[in-house]
Amino acid sequence: MASSSSSFPSSSISSTSKWTYDVFLSFSGEDTRNTATDFIYYALVEKGINTFKDNQKLEKGKTIKPKLLRAIKESKFAIVILSENYAFSTWCLDELVEIIDCETKKEITVFPIFYNVDPSDVRKQIGTFSLVKHEKHFKEKVETWKAALSHVADLAGYHVKN
């Protein structure tokens, strides 16, 4: 990650900018909150990069909070840390849809990190990225989630095996 830090601003975005945050971190807290996500977060903050990281545990079945949607829209970059449990979280999937929507409108630049997962599993929605587990309760959202996962898997990113 250190080699990519030059892609980010060296200091926080000015108050006249439309961005409140330099970077928005999207991650599954279950697998990465205290490991990869914290490492990335503190490395960015140490470089003076204003980074949004949601610190709350998310309740199952709750919809994505307006605060998070606003933080995505107010960020210049998004780092999406795709890990083993990412697709188990409907919250993460909803967040990803919003990030990809902003990316396709050229409002945000997305950097995926495939953390202990194969990018082709994300692209094809197989293994832990299969959305079959969600089809019964979230049928209306599954196709949108699949499209977002395929899109993020096609972006240039980092494949990290720990």
Listing of model-derived features with the role each one plays in the protein:
Residues Y42-E46, T51, K57, I64-N162:
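Cross-kingdom TIR/SEFIR domain
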